[in-house]
């Protein structure tokens, strides 16, 4: 939904880098909990397969630092099982041609740093300005980032706005 940029400019404004033309692809898979919730446990395997069929670029996969495995116990309850992940250094956005993610919030950092996003069409906030067909990895969309950030800003509120009804009012406008 189109929103004015006032909230973005007041609360979230930051420098937005020009679009970059890096060489590699950054893949940010959903956490195990998200993959389980959305029933996309095969997302990473399918995504890598699609990317390899459509590009010869280097693909870096970066898991979230804390990503416990979700399992079902003997009575059928969902439980988490801690599993170590490799925490890589800070992302060097200059290296990347695109970020591919299911619905990671890191897409905001990617877009802010000038790296276009490929994402899930239904479950990612970046979908309105990003390519959702991963087979088009060589032709990213370069959408209006400020419009997206402005829309996202209208879904974040201060404690005062939650207490005084502003948040509720904005939610009911949508």
Ranges and model annotations:
Residues 1-22, 36-38, 128-174:
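Leloir-type glycosyltransferase catalytic cores
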Residues 13-14, 45, 85-88:
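A generic local structural motif
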Residues 20-71:
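Conserved catalytic-core segment of nucleotide-activated headgroup transferases in glycan assembly
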Residues 24-25, 57-59, 117, 146-152:
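Hydrophobic anchor at the start of a short beta-strand
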Residues 50-53, 110, 124-127:
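Glycine-rich loops and low-complexity Gly/Arg-rich segments
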Residues 60-113:
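Donor nucleotide-activated moiety binding/catalytic core segment of transferases
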Residues 78-88, 118, 131-138:
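Short acidic-hydrophobic, aromatic-tinged amphipathic segments that line or gate anion-handling sites
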Residues 103-107, 117-130:
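Short glycine/proline-centered loop/turn elements that form peptide/ligand docking sites
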């Amino acid at each position: 939904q189109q929103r004015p940029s006032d909230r973005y400019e007041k609360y979230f404004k930051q420098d937005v880098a020009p679009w970059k033309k890096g060489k590699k692809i950054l893949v940010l898979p959903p956490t195990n909990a998200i993959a389980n919730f959305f029933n996309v446990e095969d997302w990473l395997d399918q995504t890598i397969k699609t990317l390899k069929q459509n590009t010869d670029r280097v693909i870096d996969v970066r898991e979230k630092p804390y990503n416990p495995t979700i399992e079902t116990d003997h009575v059928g309850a969902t439980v988490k099982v801690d599993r170590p992940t490799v925490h890589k250094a800070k992302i060097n956005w200059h290296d990347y041609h695109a970020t591919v993610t299911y619905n990671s919030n890191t897409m905001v950092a990617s877009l802010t740093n000038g790296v276009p996003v490929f994402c899930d069409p239904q479950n990612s906030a970046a979908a309105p300005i990003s390519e959702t067909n991963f087979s088009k990895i060589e032709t990213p969309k370069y959408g209006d980032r400020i419009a997206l950030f402005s829309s996202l800003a209208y879904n974040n509120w201060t404690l005062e706005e939650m207490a005084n009804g502003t948040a509720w009012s904005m939610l009911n406008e949508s």
